[in-house]
């Protein structure tokens, strides 16, 4: 236990929480420009071609963002919005593309869980 005098001279250092999404700078989302749109394969034991984009953010960070949903319209120079949220079977992918925002279209055929994919309510 430190004495009062020791604490006066050198106070206790606060605990620093490490963030899982450093490129967001404590913001809920960030805008960026796609520098490369490609597919990559997941870790074992999964098998697929996952759609991802390399994104240059407005704060200068360059990150990899996952493009969720079936089909997308992204290409190089598309302006997109990214949010936090990693993809467990893709190493190094810590961000998700927000569907239905900026240049990224929503998933057109979506009927359930539409809000996560930027899909409008279908005309019944």
Curated annotation (Swiss-Prot):
The question of whether Transcription is a record keyword is answered with: no
Look up the record and give one Gene Ontology term from the biological process aspect. Answer: translation
Family matches, as Pfam families:
Ribosom_S12_S23
Q: Where is the signal peptide?
A: none
**Residue numbers bearing the 3-methylthioaspartic acid modification:** 89
What UniProt keywords are attached to this protein's entry?
A: Methylation, Ribonucleoprotein, Ribosomal protein, RNA-binding, rRNA-binding, tRNA-binding
Spell out the CDD domains in the cross-references.
Ribosomal_S12
Is ATP-binding found in the keyword set?
Answer: no
Provide one Gene Ontology cellular component: small ribosomal subunit
Any one Gene Ontology MF annotation carried by this entry is: rRNA binding
HAMAP family tied to this protein: Ribosomal_uS12_B
* Subunit structure of this chain's protein: Part of the 30S ribosomal subunit. Contacts proteins S8 and S17. May interact with IF1 in the 30S initiation complex.
Family note: Belongs to the universal ribosomal protein uS12 family.
* Stated role: With S4 and S5 plays an important role in translational accuracy.
Name of the protein? Small ribosomal subunit protein uS12
Name of the gene encoding the protein in the UniProt record: rpsL
